[in-house]
Swiss-Prot record:
Belongs to the bacterial ribosomal protein bL36 family. The lineage of its organism: Bacteria, Bacillati, Bacillota, Clostridia, Thermoanaerobacterales. The keyword Glycosyltransferase does not apply. GO terms for molecular function: structural constituent of ribosome. InterPro entries: Ribosomal_bL36, Ribosomal_bL36_sp. GO terms for cellular component: cytoplasm; ribonucleoprotein complex; ribosome. The keyword Nucleotidyltransferase does not apply. This is Large ribosomal subunit protein bL36. Keywords: Ribonucleoprotein, Ribosomal protein. GO terms for biological process: translation. It holds the Pfam family Ribosomal_L36.
Amino acid sequence: MKVRPSVKKMCEKCKIIKRKGRVMVICENPKHKQKQG
């Protein structure tokens, strides 16, 4: 899980979602998981 000021899709399979008011990226590739914060 990467924590970044700005989250971006890193590949085609990345999905941007909002959880508890936080923007997150979920993906099949665990390296692509990101959280804004």
